[in-house]
């Protein structure tokens, strides 16, 4: 396999001038030879966007610090790509559209104009420091102390009038390996993969910024031994099939996981709040514009939920979400244990409902709000809580532990609760309920005739 050093293509360390051109030359040289490794030697490098291509490995030596430009206009180099030109129909200037402004959706629409900003690969919103389109066998491998830094790039034309480019955007790629580096302070999501297949992410550390890793309509995803300290959701996405997440630390100021999939195993993970870095949406416009660090003082950093269901109309969901097992995990200081709310008032939970989810061997501390298990009438939920050790905050004393509606079955097999709750289950519909091995919690199941409401997150 061909190996080249990017310095031989003009890469200069520790200067203010943008260096993405030299890195791209090295990538394109290897691509023309059928693939290879592009080595980035120790040093600080400022850059706009670079495009990985099939059979290319980007290797970051120890001490590499790739710093994204603070100018969001520096991330459009892909539009002038002459090696693999992007077809005009895949390029759009469509602006970001807040999903909460789109009403009346009942089914997925492939060509809905409001979602062009997300679904087409060459949009402003999809910009990133590192991107790949229609590529296979691509890798980003970092040695210890290699860093990719988004410098909190501010874009007044971006999402919510401030979010800048992602750290990485991979669109319709196969056989993706991400390993070893630290990625921090990205203008938007650190990793954004859509329509990808066979993904492994190992020993990656994500700090500050927004979401840590977003997988949408992907197949065969493995995330192992990664560390997330994020201002937004640690791991997010939906429409995925076959997912394994193991041995990760997820520290968030939003949800540890805002996620859904068909066939998913999440095991041996710690989901810990409050966030080490604040949710940047709580910062002032002046702080955002200056690219200020994600400080905690005066900004929100509580973890809203350990697991929040996710399924909106922006991307396809090819299979019914379900068969999700979360096992041998710890939830610490998450306000909510589970937040599944298909009642209709949740912007990001409206497309395909969840069929089944099980929590097994979970220790949860300082839960502050009820478990929401509100399914769909046409696809009632199967919920299993098995061998759960949970402590709840004082404010739960007048609240029910579980809120349930449109459920096929609720099986509780081993539940120890430290602290007081009003009732075990409050239900808005009927279904099969099995209760065994309760300790420290009443076995009462009550019915509520008032309309169900849960605050969206």
Regions found by a protein language model. Give the residues of each.
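Extracellular/periplasmic carbohydrate-active domains that bind, remodel
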Residues: 1-457
């Amino acid at each position: 396999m061909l190996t080249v050093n990017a310095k031989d293509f003009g890469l200069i360390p520790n200067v203010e001038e943008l260096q993405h051109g030299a890195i791209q030359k090295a990538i394109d040289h290897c691509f023309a030879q059928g693939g290879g490794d592009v080595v980035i030697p120790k040093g600080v490098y400022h850059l706009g966007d670079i495009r990985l291509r099939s059979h290319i490995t980007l290797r970051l030596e120890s001490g590499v610090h790739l710093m994204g430009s603070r100018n969001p206009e520096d991330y459009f180099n892909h539009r002038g790509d002459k090696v693999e030109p992007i077809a005009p129909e895949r390029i759009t200037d469509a602006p970001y559209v807040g999903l909460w402004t789109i009403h009346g959706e009942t089914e997925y629409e492939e060509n809905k104009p409001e979602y062009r900003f997300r679904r087409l690969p060459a949009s402003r919103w999809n910009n990133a420091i590192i991107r790949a389109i229609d590529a296979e066998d691509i890798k980003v491998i970092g040695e210890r102390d290699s860093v990719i830094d988004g410098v909190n790039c501010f874009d007044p034309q971006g999402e919510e009038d401030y979010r800048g480019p992602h750290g990485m955007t991979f669109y319709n790629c196969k056989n993706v390996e991400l390993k070893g580096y630290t990625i921090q302070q990205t203008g938007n999501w650190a990793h954004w993969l859509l329509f990808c297949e066979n993904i492994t992410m190992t020993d990656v550390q994500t700090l500050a910024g927004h979401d840590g890793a977003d997988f949408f309509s992907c197949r065969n995803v493995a995330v192992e031994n990664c560390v997330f300290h994020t201002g937004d959701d640690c791991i997010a996405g939906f429409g995925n099939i076959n997912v394994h997440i193991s041995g990760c630390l997820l520290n968030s100021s939003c949800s540890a996981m805002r996620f859904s999939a068909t066939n998913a195993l999440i095991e041996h993970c710690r989901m810990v709040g409050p966030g080490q870095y604040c949710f940047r949406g709580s910062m002032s416009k002046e702080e955002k514009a200056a690219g200020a660090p994600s400080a905690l003082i005066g900004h929100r950093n509580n973890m809203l939920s350990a697991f929040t269901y996710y399924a909106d109309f922006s991307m396809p969901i090819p299979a019914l979400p379900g068969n999700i097992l979360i096992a041998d995990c710890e939830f610490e200081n998450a306000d909510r244990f589970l937040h599944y709310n298909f009642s209709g008032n949740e912007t990001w939970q409206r497309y395909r409902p969840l069929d089944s989810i099980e929590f097994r061997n979970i220790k949860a501390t300082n839960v502050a709000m009820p478990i929401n298990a509100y399914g769909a009438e046409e696809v009632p939920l199967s919920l299993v809580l098995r061998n759960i050790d949970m402590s709840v905050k004082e404010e739960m004393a007048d609240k029910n532990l579980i809120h349930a509606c449109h459920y096929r079955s609720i099986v509780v097999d081993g539940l120890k609760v430290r602290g007081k709750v009003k009732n075990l289950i409050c239900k808005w519909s009927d279904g099969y309920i099995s209760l065994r091995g309760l300790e420290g919690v009443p076995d009462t199941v009550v019915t509520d005739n008032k309309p169900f409401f849960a605050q969206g997150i």
